[in-house]
């Protein structure tokens, strides 16, 4: 029983490390190559994930905006599939990408983002355009994840493996 629990815990820690690494690499990839996120310990991570709504009624749009038809990078799909259940993110509002920016370039939101998002949502509901949902991950969560996955976890994981292997040798 104890061996089984140790094996399960070891597998869980390995999965945790893998998902953390995927998240961190994804955030850095988006920041460096797609310019659609800010990765900093003091700022928030803003991701604009393309979503298409099938309903033409604004109330239905608000209810069904979790329907994913992801048109972006595979890294965004990885974040949604593996990382989003683990982090305290929320969908703040819906926006259209500004026309002044080039394709693939998404600006960081300002303090008036929610007002602009509300305006864009109403405008998109009237025109039936493809919207983008803003996923906001707090900067301190990014900082804590980075510290844990790249500093603390590599230090404690070998100790855990060593202890579990010694226990297995006693069996």
UniProtKB/Swiss-Prot annotation:
It is found in: Membrane. GO terms for cellular component: membrane. It is a multi-pass membrane protein. The keyword Secreted does not apply. The chain crosses the membrane at residues 71-91, 141-161. The keyword Secreted does not apply. Keywords: Membrane, Signal, Transmembrane, Transmembrane helix. Residues 25-70, 162-171 are extracellular. Residues 1-24 form the signal peptide. Residues 92-140 are cytoplasmic. Partially overlaps TDP1. This is Putative uncharacterized membrane protein YBR224W. It comes from Saccharomyces cerevisiae (strain ATCC 204508 / S288c) (Baker's yeast). The lineage of its organism: Eukaryota, Fungi, Dikarya, Ascomycota, Saccharomycotina.
